[in-house]
Amino acid sequence: LSLRQTKTDKVDARTIASMLMSDVNLKSYSDTFYHNEELKSLTRYRFDKVKERAKLKTSVSRLVCILFPELEKLVPTLHMASVYALLSEFPSAKHVATAHLTRLTNLLSKSSKGRYGKDTAITFRDSARASIGSNMPAKSLELKHTIKLIQELDSEIDEIENEIKIIMDEINSPILSIPGINYRMGAMIIAEIGDFNRFDSPDKILAYAGFSPSTYQSGQLDGAYAHMEKRGSRYLRYALYNATKYVCHWDPTFAAYLAKKRAEGKHYNVAISHAVKKLVRVIYHLEKTKQQYIKAA
């Protein structure tokens, strides 16, 4: 570097080159790093969208309880295409009660792909005519708009998931060979952990996710029942916890391990946390060795 006040492209280029050559810790921008950053952005974006949709679904349940409370007992769930189609067209018990039977039948048949027909339409209309639901135009309008927002979010989430799947297909991670881990949850785990070479052991990943037990000691008091730290990446903690529940359902080895911990008298959440540790050890091994998970016979 010169003490003279010189600013040219050549001087700038030489300065940058000198800095890069002197820093031995700098690493090139790899495809793996790019994929991890893209996945992190996409999975966190999806997480926020799903959370937003969940709040809207709660609002739908609340509004239906006001406008047509009997409907919830007539269907498996309010959050299905046929129910949304019904409420978008007839957003209260009064609207359903006065609906033309042919129109109601056609709407239900089309939106349910033939599952619901005339008999269901009659059941809905009879229930609506005897309903104790309130006739509130403002709430009906809110219900229609809320359903529309949910449908828009569904479309956005599908688009995000398509982008996630494209990247996951390129990465071809071995953790997707674990029963119960799909590309959505797998993508979240990979994105939040990033480069597995950063971690010397599975315990470091657990600490990074906030699954390590906290330590409390003061005087003669030593915390015997330490809680999890719950620090670090909340996204990774969420992904590992939920992935573990699915894996324990679909994989016999993990199912037996969870049952063993429950038989020892541990609370369900405590037993799941033990299974999380086991899953992280498996994921760490698979990513380090690039081996596929072999399901026990």
Model-derived features with residue positions:
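A detector of single, family-specific signature residues
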Residues: 1-297
